[in-house]
């Protein structure tokens, strides 16, 4: 029992290095470093470079591209370098420092000739002898890397590659989502026991190795303990050793981690995986591990050689000149080169990039308010740099935005406003909202796309239930979609007919004899389909939709809003009346919509349409767990239209006029159209007028939004018909980039719409409505930070990781991806499960960057004390800021910006 507790504790702690990965069909953005945020971004970057040779700073090409495009101000970087040098004093000649800085800041690599120079070896040996004890302690973490990493096989590759191939084979077999005709025997017992049963007959192992497998314990914890003991790993090093194995295939390990969270019977899945992996490593390594030295001297020597070579190259100091100094002077030089290494400068370039964006964002807001002030002929806008030394990046805005609490203009909707449309905070909504507001008397609002409803949806046209809320929160309720019994029976029969056709096709494909006949039967049809889809993608897609509407038309449905008893459900079905009131009130507060209602209020979720795209879920709503958010929008709109709910809201101080009607729609981000999901049968005269006005304006809005969006896609030539071109992108089965998704996301603004209204934020900003004056206890802000802002940060860091380290955190080229086991994609037929974004999602071309890899900038419109209170109440968020996993800026009641560094 003691062994089991110890091993389970080790694995529980080691899981911090990977992240749970959902299947690609419900792809949800994940922060790959969420479990590591107790350390600073810089420390994690150093650790990953040491243990996996993964660099998570933007490389030289990305930095140069940012400078060329005006996204990175070199003067900001130079000032950061100057400030850093002022903080340190080095007792070496200044001209060496100047030369070193001028060269290393270009991020050019040290030529191999410098590393191989004999004098470099002499200096390294000299320093190693003097610092052996200290350096051995510094490099202790190298000792506990997997043994298979240190042993090279006959083909010249680490044995860990053979271990990986074995684990890919077995993990694919276990995790298969019922795509294969035969499932893994005994998988219902556990992954480990199924492997034990099958591996005894696997002739990729030798006869002696299979005998070892037969004698393994039935307990995976005991197996892990046995292998670690065999390799003479000290107990204090267990976690580091296990972490090395989890990081070897973080995709497959992450998928198993996800499944262990979803199913109680698979809660020890990572333990099974590690037991199998360690056994495979032991079988392949054998006694060779004894030749792997635990002495750190060779690695310390290599570190000294690299540092000496860097010093000589960047400072233009010949190595023989360095040798003319005594050992203490040489140590001073080495200390300088070590503390001013290339990764320090990569970090400074990244910070300068982020500071440049922060400055540009403030300038946009400043210019927007100057324009508004001039147009309205109101009091002069005083824009001046803040001379407070403690706030070096502040700017003062005294305009219509910097008003006192008694000014009611910010709390009242304009008398001519016909409709208020609440969009998801998704960055793709920002341009669409801007064009809607410019098209007529419409007001837009930002809120997370799940609309504050912690639900699991059970839709009639979806095979599986889906958790329609942020992935870090478990659902608390189940909402079922249903229709009249007759309509449902007809629809189910149609579904079964379609399913039978696909199942028959699959059955023929997966069986020996029928598969020989299948090409003859299906070849002509599939060939014709391929030709038509290639030549006329938009028309073929439209025809397919018409056929689907005719033969598989979804009936008019209702939702189980009221609480129902269902003994088969593990979650409450529907809401009580008080819960409906509470969720409606919470959502309206999060939208900052508790008064001055327009006649027509639209709750707009969003969805994306693309064809032949395994990563389609990555373009859906991140706040709904990688699915469209129209379901949540419809549910909340129906709740808000209920008389008993409105009466309950009235008792809470929120009065919705009888003439105000709530409706639901979906913003299709790939075509910038608004599709109605739910419109009540009866509309008031004012609501009907608003509904018609919005529909009339939508064609122009779509054309303008599509033109703006398509101009950013690497299309060929000028787009003359943006709406048709957008539809072609969404319909073309060969299109690798139907839309940019959330690429270039950079900031999250929490504040009143007046702060950013009319300002072109280039589709880079998440926008969430918030009025600190109505949030007396700070709970609303804490909710926004803990939910929507966290989702945005995860999205931001996934795009960041997929850009700076695509080989490790991305998913490669779409054209060479292989969908495997129904859960994800690989490159080829035996790679790690590629769990990030594809190359085409972040790059405009092979050598042309599109996404800007900078950490999310959160902007809060509130006084300093509100932000300070947030830090006190939300230690998790405070840690993210202090450890540099995101940046924070606020704008207070005087209109003064402050960077919280």
Curated annotation (Swiss-Prot):
Keyword Amino-acid biosynthesis: no
UniProt KW keywords: Cell membrane, Membrane, Metal-binding, Transport, Zinc
Topology within the bilayer: Peripheral membrane protein
GO molecular function: zinc ion binding
Pfam families assigned: DabA
Cofactor field: Zn(2+)
Functional description taken from the UniProt entry: Part of an energy-coupled inorganic carbon pump.
HAMAP family in UniProt: DabA
Name of the protein described by the UniProt record: Probable inorganic carbon transporter subunit DabA
Organism: Staphylococcus aureus (strain JH9)
């Amino acid at each position: 029992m003691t062994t089991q507790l110890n091993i389970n504790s080790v694995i529980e702690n080691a899981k911090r290095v990977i992240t749970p990965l959902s299947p690609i069909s419900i792809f949800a953005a994940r922060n790959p470093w969420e479990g590591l945020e107790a350390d600073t971004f810089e420390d994690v970057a150093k650790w990953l470079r040491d243990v996996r040779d993964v660099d998570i700073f933007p490389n030289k090409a990305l930095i140069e591209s940012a400078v060329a495009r005006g996204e990175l101000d070199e003067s900001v970087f130079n000032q950061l370098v100057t400030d850093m040098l002022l903080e340190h004093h080095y007792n070496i000649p200044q001209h060496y420092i100047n030369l070193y800085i001028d060269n290393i800041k270009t991020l050019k690599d040290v030529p191999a000739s410098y590393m191989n120079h004999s004098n470099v070896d002499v200096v390294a040996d000299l320093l190693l002898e003097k610092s052996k004890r200290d350096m051995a302690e510094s490099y202790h973490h190298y000792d506990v890397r997997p043994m298979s990493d240190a042993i090279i096989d006959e083909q010249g590759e680490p044995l860990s590659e053979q271990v990986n191939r074995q684990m890919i084979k077995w993990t694919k077999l276990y995790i298969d989502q019922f795509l294969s005709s035969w499932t893994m025997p005994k998988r219902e017992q556990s992954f480990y026991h199924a492997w034990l049963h099958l591996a005894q007959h696997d002739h990729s192992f030798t006869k002696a190795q299979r005998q070892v497998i037969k004698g393994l314990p039935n307990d995976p914890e005991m197996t892990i303990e046995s292998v670690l003991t065999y390799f003479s790993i000290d107990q204090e090093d267990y976690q580091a050793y296990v972490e090395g194995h989890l990081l070897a295939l973080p995709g497959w390990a992450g998928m198993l981690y996800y499944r262990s969270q979803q199913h109680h019977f698979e809660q020890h899945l990572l333990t099974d995986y590690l037991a199998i992996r360690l056994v495979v490593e032991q079988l392949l390594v054998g006694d060779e591990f004894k030749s792997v030295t635990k002495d750190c001297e060779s690695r310390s020597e290599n570190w000294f050689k690299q540092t000496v070579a860097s010093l000589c190259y960047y400072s233009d100091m010949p190595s023989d000149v360095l040798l003319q100094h005594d050992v203490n002077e040489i140590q001073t030089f080495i200390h300088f080169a070590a503390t001013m290494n290339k990764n320090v400068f990569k970090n400074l370039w990244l910070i300068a990039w982020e500071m440049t964006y922060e400055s540009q964002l403030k300038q946009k807001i400043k210019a927007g308010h100057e324009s508004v002030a001039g147009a309205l002929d109101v009091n002069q806008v005083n824009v001046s740099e803040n001379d407070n030394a403690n706030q070096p990046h502040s700017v003062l805005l005294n305009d219509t935005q910097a008003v006192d609490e008694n000014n009611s203009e910010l709390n009242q909707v304009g008398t001519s406003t016909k409709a208020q449309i609440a969009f998801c905070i998704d960055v793709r909504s920002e341009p669409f909202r801007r064009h809607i507001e410019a098209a007529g008397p419409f007001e837009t609002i930002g809120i997370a796309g799940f609309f504050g409803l912690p639900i699991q949806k059970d839709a009639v046209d979806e095979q599986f239930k889906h958790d329609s809320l942020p992935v870090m929160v478990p659902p608390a309720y189940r909402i079922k979609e249903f229709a009249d019994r007759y309509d449902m029976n007809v629809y189910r029969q149609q579904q079964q007919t379609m399913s039978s056709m696909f199942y028959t096709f699959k059955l023929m494909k997966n069986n020996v004899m029928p598969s020989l006949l299948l090409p003859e039967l299906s070849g002509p049809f599939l060939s014709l389909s391929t030709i038509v889809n290639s030549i006329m993608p938009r028309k073929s897609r439209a025809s397919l939709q018409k056929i689907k509407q005719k033969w598989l038309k979804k009936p008019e449905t209702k939702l189980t809003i009221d609480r129902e008893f269902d003994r088969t459900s593990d979650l409450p079905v529907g809401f009580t009346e008080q819960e409906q009131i509470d969720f409606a009130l919470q959502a309206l507060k999060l939208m900052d919509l508790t008064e001055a209602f327009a006649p027509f209020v639209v709750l707009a979720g969003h969805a994306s349409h693309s064809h032949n795209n395994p990563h389609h879920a990555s373009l859906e709503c991140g706040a709904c767990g990688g699915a469209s958010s129209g379901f949540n929008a419809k549910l909340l709109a129906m709740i808000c239209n209920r008389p008993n709910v409105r009466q309950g809201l009235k008792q809470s101080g929120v009065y919705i006029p009888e003439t105000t009607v709530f409706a639901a729609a979906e913003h299709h981000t790939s075509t910038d159209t608004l599709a109605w999901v739910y419109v009540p049968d009866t509309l008031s005269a004012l609501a009907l007028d608003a509904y018609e006005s919005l529909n009339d304006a939508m064609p122009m809005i779509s054309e303008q939004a599509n033109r703006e969006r398509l101009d950013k896609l690497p299309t060929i030539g000028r787009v003359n018909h943006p709406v048709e071109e957008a539809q072609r992108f969404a319909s073309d089965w060969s299109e690798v980039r139907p839309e940019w998704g959330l690429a270039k996301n950079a900031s999250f603004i929490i504040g009143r719409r007046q702060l950013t209204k009319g300002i072109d934020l280039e589709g880079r900003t998440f926008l969430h409505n918030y009025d600190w004056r109505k949030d007396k206890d700070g709970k609303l802000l804490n909710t926004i930070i803990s939910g929507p802002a966290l989702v945005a940060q995860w999205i931001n860091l996934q795009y960041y990781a997929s850009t700076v380290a695509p080989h490790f955190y991305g998913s490669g080229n779409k054209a060479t991806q292989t969908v495997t086991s129904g859960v994800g994609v690989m490159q080829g037929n035996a790679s790690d499960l590629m769990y990030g974004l594809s190359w085409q999602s972040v790059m405009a071309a092979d050598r042309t960057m599109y996404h800007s890899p900078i950490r999310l900038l959160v902007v809060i419109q509130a006084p300093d004390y509100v932000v300070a209170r947030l830090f006190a109440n939300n230690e998790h968020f405070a840690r993210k800021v202090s450890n540099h996993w995101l940046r924070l800026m606020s704008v207070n009641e005087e209109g003064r910006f402050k960077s919280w560094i």
